[in-house]
Design a protein with these regions (language model features):
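N-terminal secretory signal peptides and thylakoid transit peptides that target proteins
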Residues: 1-19
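C-terminal segment of N-terminal export signals and the immediately downstream linker at the start
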Residues: 26-52
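Conserved, mostly hydrophobic/aromatic
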Residues: 42, 54, 84, 111, ...
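N-terminal small/glycine-rich loop or linker at the start of catalytic domains
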Residues: 45-60, 156-159
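Structured C-terminal cap/extension of enzyme domains
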Residues: 82, 230-341
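Glycine-rich, proline-tolerant flexible connector loops at the mouths of alpha/beta enzymes
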Residues: 85-113, 162-163
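Alpha-helix-loop-beta-strand connector modules within alpha/beta enzyme cores
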Residues: 101, 105-125, 176-181
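Glycine/proline-rich, positively charged
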Residues: 131-220, 224-227, 237-244
Length: 341
């Protein structure tokens, strides 16, 4: 889950974006009441989350963006966002000879600056991309330190792609031991799993452990190849799990002149599915405000409109679902970062 840069540069009308921002500004000034974002239950956790949540990528994971990142995070909370997602891997420097837990990621660092004073206002989620017990515990300690908190509301296995990873996680001294230990010691409240690569692998993961939540890729192109909707989403709903959608703009690749040309369609599409919330990383406050405005005004799409959006993506599935590329047998030169939401 990355930014919507292509959306803004190429497709979103300045007037529409300005109108959304102006409406939210009036609300902030107290001169006009805006509807609150709808809430949904986060599965069996008992928590209610707003239908739009803030992702910890895009600007928030980049070095040198402290002021912009803190502005986005604070504005999100001001607008009613009560779920923030991040990961130990987000914004982590790539330094040879260093272990994961020796490298502090920018996303958790920036979010932690805000959490120092606003922790009680949000449900805070992070992730471990280490598949071992000891490595994951070190990453959890790092997350708590950077996020300036004594516990996470949700700790997740990050981007499960292959059965070999599941075997390591559930094997001797695997990461699942860290998740259980952390929950027993009240360092985390709930446990989750995430992925956007191969839905069959995630289904097998759900069969091996009673996770509380799942973060999965969902957008109008999903149904065309290796669908998450009919497999992972269906199983997660059956298990009464909290479901968080990601990859809605697909790093901007879902937007094409001949296809989908704005964020409202795909965001409304995913919110019309049986999900608890969605996460999107934002480049700036204006993007955040536009997403919140769409969420506030959300009404479920009729089946015909859902089908129309799916049809628009049918000619560029390998772009709109690029994150499935290896599992789907596609390749794109230069796409070397699978460890993102």
């Amino acid at each position: 889950m990355r930014d919507q840069t292509l959306t803004r540069r190429e497709f979103v009308k300045v007037g529409a974006a300005g109108a959304a921002g102006a409406a939210l500004a009036l609300t902030a000034a107290g001169t006009e009441a805006a509807p609150a974002m709808p809430e949904r239950p986060l599965g069996r956790t008992g928590h209610k989350v707003r239908i739009f949540s803030l992702g910890g990528q895009a600007t928030i994971e980049k070095p040198g963006t402290r002021d912009e990142s803190i502005a986005i995070i604070n504005r999100a909370i001001d607008l009613g966002v009560n779920y923030i997602d991040t990961a130990a891997a987000y914004g982590r420097p790539r330094t040879e000879g260093k272990e994961r837990w020796e490298l502090d990621g920018w996303s958790q660092t920036y979010i932690g600056e805000v959490m120092a004073t606003r922790r009680k206002e949000v449900f805070l989620a992070s992730k471990t991309d280490d598949r071992t017990r000891d490595g994951s515990m070190r990453l959890l300690e790092q997350s708590l330190r950077l996020l300036k908190t004594d516990h996470l509301d949700l700790w997740q296995l990050h981007n499960i792609m292959r059965d070999e990873q599941l075997d390591q996680i559930f094997g001797k001294d695997g990461a699942i031991e860290a998740l259980q230990k952390a929950k027993d010691q009240k360092m985390v409240r709930y446990l989750g799993i995430t992925g956007h690569f191969d839905p069959a692998v995630l289904v097998r993961g759900l069969d091996r452990f009673p996770f509380d939540t799942i973060l999965m890729a969902l957008n109008p192109a999903d149904k065309h190849h290796l669908p998450f909707v009919s497999t992972v989403l269906a199983l997660a709903n059956k298990k009464n799990m909290g479901v968080i959608g990601m990859k809605i703009p697909a790093r901007g690749r879902i937007f094409k002149p001949e296809g989908i040309n704005g964020i409202k369609g795909p965001l409304s599409y995913v919110l019309s599915l049986p999900v608890s919330t969605v996460i999107i990383g934002c480049d700036n406050v204006q993007q955040l405000e536009e997403n919140v405005e769409i969420a506030r005004a959300f009404k479920p799409l009729p089946a015909a409109e859902m089908a129309r959006l799916e049809g628009l993506t049918s000619t560029y599935v390998n772009d709109a679902s690029w994150f499935k590329r290896d599992a789907a047998g596609w390749t794109r030169p230069g796409d070397d970062d699978q460890n993102t939401e």
